[in-house]
């Protein structure tokens, strides 16, 4: 239910010029702590400005220590951490943002808004430069902001120790060798914390009920921060129902009824920073169907709907593995058809070699007709990424398209496995 997917150049290696992109030795440059960089994005459909908010030192870096340079090249935004006046890259990270999705809305053509966002990096031992990039619709990287971080700067605030219980839901594996997920509750009152802990167990059960996650149970840690809300359930503006909740999740995000997200980035990141994390997942205490997932940003899923298990996994496909939605609508044109999308499970055939061409039997037609004889065949089926024409998906059905098949296709499974290994090896 990711509202918008955008595109990537197959020649993305140019995005850093001549900078050195080999993996680096973690302990040489970084401490065990995490640096959170809070910033603002101000803009509309056509323009954007960046402004630094603050720097926060958090207790524990939750990301990888071996794979510090992000060679996935996923996402519409990325950061690079370098030594000042040097071509030596220490860390890079790709991601997407709620702001980027908002820029595609009709509202963005009429008004200017500001969004609070954050990135986290390993806490440096010496001064570093952090450069922020955004990609155009043609996936050309554009530098947006550069800051110098001095780890001895007394304006770097230590993260507050919050008075909320932390629950170890699943796993006790080394942080550097695991995918660390933090679960946050929204719309659970203090009296409903027991329900939240049960929903956390439901999350874990759901996660490991689907391939390929079921094969990697020893590579995940799941922790939860037990923050109560004043009100039960979450906000539903279209029904004139407004709840006071810990994370302010709301349906009708961008005026799309089922899209349930939060604009309160600072609260979300402050709570998440109480534990080491790679991925943030908000469980919304409501029976209404909905949710959302943004790559390397956060996911939301409701817990009371009969499709809750499927929604949890579908949204995590967006947030964790960068998977695109494979369903389509008439009259949408989110993708530029002469550019290969960055998401691993859709293609414009501009650079199909970089996608799943190696998984297609040479007897399968490309594009592949949607016919019963191809029902379980990896092919190239038209209609994906919200567009009925010019964008193709790997199979007739998949969890990223509908919940009828109740499983990921082989292409999505491979993409998920690659991401698990990226974080854990």
Region spans (language model):
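Solvent-exposed loop/turn segments at secondary-structure junctions
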Residues: 187-190, 228-232, 286-290, 306-308, ...
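Short pre-active-site segment immediately N-terminal to the catalytic Zn-binding motif
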Residues: 193-196, 291-315
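Active-site-proximal segments of metallohydrolase catalytic domains
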Residues: 219-295
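Catalytic Zn2+-binding segment of zinc metalloproteases
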Residues: 316-332
């Amino acid at each position: 239910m990711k509202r918008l997917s955008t595109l990537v150049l197959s020649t993305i290696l140019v995005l850093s010029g001549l900078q050195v992109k080999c993996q680096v030795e973690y302990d040489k440059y970084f401490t065990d702590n995490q640096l959170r960089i809070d910033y603002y994005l101000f803009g509309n459909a056509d323009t954007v400005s960046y402004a630094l908010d603050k720097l926060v030192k958090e207790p524990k870096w939750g990301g990888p220590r071996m794979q510090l340079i992000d060679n996935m090249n996923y996402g519409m935004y990325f950061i690079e951490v370098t030594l000042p006046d040097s071509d030596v890259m220490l860390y890079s990270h790709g991601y997407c943002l709620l702001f980027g999705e908002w820029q595609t809305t009709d509202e963005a053509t009429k008004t200017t808004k500001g969004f609070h966002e954050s990135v986290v990096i390993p806490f440096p031992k010496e001064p570093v430069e952090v450069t922020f990039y955004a990609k155009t619709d043609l996936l050309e990287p554009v530098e947006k902001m550069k800051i110098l971080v001095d780890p001895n700067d007394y304006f770097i605030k230590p993260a507050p120790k919050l008075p909320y219980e932390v629950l170890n839901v699943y796993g006790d594996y080394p942080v550097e060798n695991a995918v660390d997920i933090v679960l946050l509750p929204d719309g659970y009152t203090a009296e409903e914390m027991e329900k939240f802990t049960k929903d956390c167990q439901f999350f874990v059960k759901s996660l490991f009920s689907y391939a390929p996650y079921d094969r990697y149970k020893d590579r995940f840690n799941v922790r939860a921060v037990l923050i109560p809300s004043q009100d039960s359930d979450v906000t539903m503006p279209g029904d004139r129902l407004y709840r006071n909740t810990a994370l302010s999740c709301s349906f009708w995000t961008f005026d799309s009824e089922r899209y349930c997200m939060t604009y309160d980035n600072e609260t979300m990141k402050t709570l998440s920073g109480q534990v080491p994390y790679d991925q943030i997942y908000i469980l919304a205490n409501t029976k209404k169907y909905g949710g959302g997932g943004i790559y390397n940003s956060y996911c939301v899923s409701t817990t009371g709907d009969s499709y809750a298990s499927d929604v949890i996994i579908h949204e995590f496909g967006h947030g964790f593995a960068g998977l695109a939605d494979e369903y389509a609508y008439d009259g949408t044109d989110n993708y530029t058809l002469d550019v290969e999308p960055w998401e691993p499970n859709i293609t414009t055939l501009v650079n199909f070699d970089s996608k799943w061409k190696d998984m297609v039997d040479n007897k399968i037609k490309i594009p592949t007709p949607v016919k019963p004889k191809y029902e379980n065949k990896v092919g190239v089926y038209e209609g994906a990424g919200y567009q009925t024409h010019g964008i193709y998906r790997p199979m007739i059905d998949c969890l990223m398209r509908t919940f009828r098949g109740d499983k990921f296709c082989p292409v999505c499974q491979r993409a998920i496995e690659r991401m698990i290994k990226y974080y854990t090896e």
